[in-house]
Amino acid sequence: VAENVHDFAWAADHDYLHTTEQVPGGPLLHFFRKDIPELEATWNELPGYMVRSFQFMDRHFGKYPWPQYSFVQGGDGGMEYPMLTLILGNRRLGSLVGLSVHESVHSWYYGVLASNEGRFPWMDEGFTEYASSEVMQELFPRSDDPHAGSIKGYLSLVASGKHEAPSIHADHFLTNRGYGSTAYSFGEMFVHQLGAVVGETALADGLLRYFDVCKFKHPEPVDFERVMEKVSGVELDWYFDQWINTTRTLDYGIRGVLSVDGELRVELERYGDQLMPVDVMLELEDGTTKHYHIPLSLERGARDPGSEPFAFVTLEPWQWTDPTYTFMLPLSMARVGAVVLDPMQRTADVDLDNNRVDLPPGAQGFIRP
């Protein structure tokens, strides 16, 4: 008997081949496919990847609660249900694994957390995309940011002029693109970008706690917000309000860099309407880097020093009403090779051209991007 499920599906075919694979300490995975020779090689490799996927999800996003899960070859695409997914099986290995990961990860968000997909489609598809990208990075490591595509997709939507507030009901978007990009790209970007606010460690801890606290409770955005606030120690109502309920865009830039009395003066400006804290990195002439974090005053705090994989210095908060921000560092301009905003490129900044200033050797005066 299936307990705590809100949907179901079943499949049957006399010609299905059925195999199983046990996740240690977890569910029994079932695999059903047609007896087609061309599918044999990839489907024989799929179980090993799915065991690793479930183990990764259990460690990083919450414990899968049910005793089994089935991957069933269906007619087209992929569709998730509690404890089962129907997937198009005739794919290359990477594609088959990617589809299977995405559809099974839905069990955590569509299945267990079960947010209202009509009201908050990005809380299902977007969170699923974020976790799936993390899983795929574990299975097929890549050198670039596994979430970069979500920022690119969101920025493409903004540039198209079809961007609508993510708070709109799924049925009421004016275009299919607006709905799709908001549910998938924006949702993943929203979670990923939150790491630039609270730090990667707090984000990871918060996502795990979110699942444990809200499972089977149909959470809304405010529930995720409260969990992240408790984990990070900063206020996040401004982040959730502006990114979910408006179409404002983010654009912070460097106005200029200059030397004042032997010290480095950096002037920043908020060109867009969207608010965010700001990360700054200095590339020094000796090849080393220095990182600085400028909290937003609305946070009423700042992320913990150990919340990032790199050391950083926290500067005075940027008052949210001020369009500009200036800070001084006890560094000779001659020691600095470049000043960079958002060096990890975790934010959906619409204009990266003003995020970097390179300082030529011996540079003096006011240097602009």
Go through each PLM region and give its residues.
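Acidic/His/Gly-enriched intrinsically disordered linker/tail segments
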Residues: 119, 125-193, 197-198, 214-215
